[in-house]
Amino acid sequence: MSSKKKKADAEVSQTQATVEVRADVDVEELEGIGRVTGAKLKERGYYTVRDIAFASVKELAEIIGNEDRAQQIIEAARKMLGLHSFISALEVYERRKKIRRISTGVRSLDELLGGGIETRAVTEIVGEFGSGKTQLCHQLAVMVQLPEERGGLGAKAIYIDTENTFRPERIMQIAKARGLDSDQALHNIFYARAYSSDHQMILVEQAKSIIKQHNVALLVVDSVIAHFRSEFPGRENLAERQQKLNKHVADLLRLADAYDVAVVITNQVMAQPDVFFGNPLRPAGGNILAHGATYRLWLRKSKENIRIAKIFDSPYHPEGEVSFRITEEGLVD
């Protein structure tokens, strides 16, 4: 390695270390934020400079009551974290090398995904009822707890359940098969049932404080679309639904990036009655989810306990598919 390359790598590493330290600085340390304003921000889930840097002007203005001041505070936070200017593609590459991955526990699926489920990204799992979406989410909530040498991150998970499909008994089965203490595996999962789309969005906001206080590396929302579809039926409500869903997905993307966690969401499918050739099913949520998710994985049933996983949208993965089995021990090749 040349001396120039070593120097460049050292500079990038030093910059990243400095940014990480500054990111966790208390919000009240920012210029323009006093104790009263700081208390208001913390009440709404903005605890650190990192939280402010990833906020929108509109969100902050609603809290502090002044749009210009909100803009100034956000700019100050982004400047502190080095987010206010361009960086070299080399630095982007070096940052990408530090991305962490959670093994799915299925070797072929990990290979399809380039090593597993990425942090700082939203991975969407699409499929019909019974295709294995929730099973995969359960397995990931266990896999993240394994040490890095076994494909995990030695971390905890947050699980937001919108359809009452979370089963602790299944977690215990998968954990036991992976050599983990089943009770401890359950203890390492923060669970919440979401009863409406509003409640679902509030839980994502509350997840920030849990991530800050605990070693959390995975956030699951299963399913992301269910409440939005039931609460906003018909074409007359579509625009309102999509606007609200857009904010929810944007919040998830910001959370993934700001806290270096893997966000996994499941999505339902819907039929296209005017399609006579090819697959008549398409993911629910329209362009909002299509553009919001970083990676999109489609699961479908095959014979007996076999499922097919296809990656159909990714910034850099080629399209491809693999098969896996659902067993009592979990998902396996």
UniProtKB/Swiss-Prot annotation:
One of its GO terms (biological process) is DNA repair. Keywords: ATP-binding, DNA damage, DNA recombination, DNA-binding, Nucleotide-binding. ATP binds at residues 127-134. Coiled coil: none annotated. Gene3D superfamilies: 5' to 3' exonuclease, C-terminal subdomain, P-loop containing nucleotide triphosphate hydrolases. SMART domains: AAA (SM00382). It comes from the Archaea. The keyword ATP-binding applies. GO terms for molecular function: ATP binding; ATP hydrolysis activity; ATP-dependent DNA damage sensor activity; damaged DNA binding. Involved in DNA repair and in homologous recombination. Binds and assemble on single-stranded DNA to form a nucleoprotein filament. Hydrolyzes ATP in a ssDNA-dependent manner and promotes DNA strand exchange between homologous DNA molecules. Belongs to the eukaryotic RecA-like protein family. This is DNA repair and recombination protein RadA.
